Amino acid sequence: QLAERDCGIELRHILRRPGKAGGPLMTEHFAEIINDPEVDVVVDVLAGIEPSRTYIREALLAGKAVVTANKAALAANYEELLGIAHAKGLPLLFEASCGGGIPWIENLKKAARIDRIESMHGILNGTGNFILDRMDRFGMDFDEALKEAQALGYAEADPTADIGGFDVANKAVISASVA
């Protein structure tokens, strides 16, 4: 409702897991979304490589612009998905996949247009940074710092992507691909 009222965006469908409760916009069938001629943009907020990669690919092939926050699917399939988007003349937007609330991807694209990027430095994972800070400054052990990060909402209930380095690896692949 906020998107419709404040931005003029009409939400047409919400894809849900099979068997989950739903409302009037809910569908279990992705084909219903990409075959709707009123849908111009598909927004992907799934986690993991599949089925997100397939959905992004199918949406682009169906002539829909795509916005995704899914760094795993994008990092694993960057060239393929960007290639389809370029071939179809469609935007594939992924600012939300890296940098949280800062416009990292857009600024990286701008910098790459005017200069050769030879290195990048920064904090790529807030959860890991929080844990390391707690361990360094307060002498906490890893598990204690992780539990605090989870209690504060900085770490997911399943922090595997953060503490296993997968989140950083995906952001690094995307950033390097853009640069």
Spans of features found by a protein language model:
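Solvent-exposed alpha-helices and their adjacent loops that cap or buttress functional pockets
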Residues: R5-C7, I34-D36, A85, A111-R116, ...
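General beta-strand structural signal in soluble alpha/beta enzymes
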Residues: M26-T27, D44, V67-A69, L92-A96, ...
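Residue-level detector of anion-binding/catalytic polar loops
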Residues: A65, P91, A155
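N-terminal glycine-/serine-/threonine-rich beta1-alpha1-beta2 phosphate-ribose binding loop
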Residues: Q1-K64
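Generic structural signal for well-ordered, non-membrane alpha-helical segments
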Residues: C7-G8, M26, I49, L74, ...
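Active-site-lining helix/loop region of Rossmann-like oxidoreductase modules
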Residues: I114-A179
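Rossmann-fold NAD(P)-binding glycine/threonine-rich loop
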Residues: S52-A62, K71-A111
